[in-house]
Amino acid sequence: MTLKELGIGQSARILTVGGEGALRQHFLDMGVIPKAEVTVIKFAPMGDPMELQVHGYELTLRLDDAAHIEVELIDSRSRKHEGPKKISNTAHPGLGEEGKYHVKGSGNPLPDGEKLTYALVGNQNCGKTTLFNQLTGSNQHVGNFPGVTVDRKDGSIKEHPDTSITDLPGIYSMSPYTNEEIVSRNFVLDNKPKAIINIVDATNIERNLYLTMQLLEMDIPMVIALNMMDEVTANSGSIDVNKIEGLLGVPVVPISAAKNQGVDELVRHAIHIAKYQERPGRQDFCDENDFGGAVHRCIHAVSHLIEDHAKLAGVPIRFAATKIIEGDALILEQLHLDENEKEAIEHLIVQMEKERGLDRSAAIADMRFTFIEKICESTVVKPKESRERIRSERIDRVLTGKYTAIPCFIVIMLAVFYLTFNVIGAGLQWLLEQGIGALTALTDKALTAAGVNEVLHGLVIDGIFQGVGSVLSFLPIIVTLFFFLSLMEDSGYIARVAFFMDKLLRKIGLSGRSIVPMLIGFGCTVPAVMATRTLPSERDRRMTILLTPFMSCSAKLPIYAFFVSAFFPKHGGLVMGGLYFLGIIVGILFAFIYRKTLFRGDAVPFVMELPNYRMPGAKNVCQLLWEKAKDFLQKAFTVILIATMLIWFLQSFDIHFNMVTDSKDSILAAISSVIVPVFKPLGLGDWRICTSLISGLMAKESVVSTLEILFGGTVTTALTTLSAASLLVFSLLYSPCVAAIASIKRELGAKWAVSVELLQCAIAWVAAFIVRVVGLLLM
């Protein structure tokens, strides 16, 4: 039978893992290997994908992929991974004690003043970025779904200016399956850091040590940060740190990154191993007696054959050998082997496969997990089921239930929009508007009393205060929206949304993982585009990038709020929600079009770990809100301020630089009149409206500041309700800001960026025209 045929609660032992290529390798790296025992936890509300437990953690898998995995039913899972009933409470040695790994004066110390460079490497969602913040004093964003870090981040260890530490994207192995794995692997191989800090989730140690073993093979000085030890001990578990050090041959430091416990000791070990270049004491993890020694002999024979090539290419020999056996094409290409050498290696691997009874990739994965099992059996007392896990199961019965998941998601999103636009955000906005209005009146009075020049007076009041002030008044709405998005992300709910939305997204040609960048897109398109780097398929990544501009970003909120309050005051929440919904609908429509034209084929398999629900940290939420508020304020007082002053100048002077009494005679009117015919069919033939939309290409918030300057509070007399609706739809769909286009250019290239800009404007024009025509027919 296959894994697909198992029911909820049933357990089985894996016999064979079908499939081929990078995806199959990814399954093996995640622990889906022959002999592994799995239990089906649940199915998504739409019946696909499934959630299963393997090696002590939860993994999602599509039914189509599960159909390629043959299993045999077992009555219950074995308890061989529980480890000893009790371990000794020997104190963990400090730096230099016992002489195991830090013998004073040993090694070949680096010259004084040479920069110590570190790679911070670990699985996704293991607390890596939290540790980076503790080590460097940075405030990088921390989340509770796989793939928060999508690019490398650099910093110096506090009080050690001669150090440089790089926070790399979270990975499960050194196999090049996803973009983040390629980024992390290339950094370690090409940049050759002086040392590696490998962060391991102590609550999920079996899965995490799989990556650790590959890092040890790279023969780079390394220290292991055993994170979340507080959670292990709180749930009656324990780990013999001294013994695990001896088995792995590197220093192991128990820490809690979230509570900043053990971090100082970790820093001392990290500085020492980098300074003295103390390399791992062990790289050979296959016993020569295991399964007849087939894998052991193969690795050593291949290592001998490629030794000269590996040294010449600068690739660690042991790492290169295991990767070649796995079938890693990138490593094979780097070594430049001749045909005779390739044939000899292939002969060795085929012989090993016959003796071992497993294919090459499965044999290497099994070798690693066998060693990990031996370590855990002798050093780890499994914690009882944690409070977090029990709580997560209870919450999931509702939030990911068969009949409740989709309704709960809709209710949650509606509640977010209602509280943002009608209650909390709107209330705070009103207070800020009163403050800005009072400050404007006070400044106006002071300038008048001082007899300030009329031009300067107009610039300050009509340009800066009226323009920038109108944008600033929308800060509470933006902060409120990000507050709720942050709660959803930190709690782990967004990962669940990806799980139960996968089947729905697959119908439009995407994977459930694409939901994460799209949800981020409701905040800002720039990080949403960057977040697509976590997608394993280039096809999915490109398609998701092209769809993110349809998700209405927070920078458009001031436009919506401005026109909704002016033209639809009694139906604000409904109109706002309708705009967001329209953006999603148009995005889905174009997803179907892209699937049939530019991106034919099926979406890649959905393989994702589901983290436990966690209470969002107040510090992390406040930090995120401050970052977003700071970004908004910086934009308001740079790009928007400059744009506002420029608009004021152009609408106050004619082509001879004489001040005009009627803005119709201004430079701005002359420029904007060129594009007025384009917008006239939309009911937007006023040159001032055209000008505001052009300024929105720089920053969407500029639309409101430009309107305030040009109309001076009389916009309701210049537009009809239908024209306002047409303008709202155009603003929703037209080209994203310069920063977003720049991020698309960085990810896809200039041609794609220009295409996105032109296509979005064309889509917006057509949609606004349809609104206009339908409105006229109904009137």
Language-model regions, residue ranges each:
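Conserved C-terminal guanine-recognition region of P-loop GTPase G domains, centered on the G4
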Residues: H160, R185-V252, I559
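Juxtamembrane inter-helical linkers in multi-pass membrane proteins
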Residues: Q434-L442, A495-T525, R600-L624, L668-A670
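Hydrophobic core segments of alpha-helical transmembrane domains in multi-pass membrane transport
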Residues: C408-L419, L481-S486, V564-A566, Y580-I593, ...
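Conserved G1/Walker A P-loop phosphate-binding module
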Residues: H92-S173
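Extended, low-charge hydrophobic alpha-helical regions
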Residues: E355, A362-D366, K382, A426-I464, ...
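Transmembrane helix-loop junctions at the membrane interface of multipass transporters and ion channels
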Residues: F550, S554-G577, A739-G749, A768-M779
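Core alpha-helical transmembrane segments of integral membrane proteins
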Residues: V398-F499
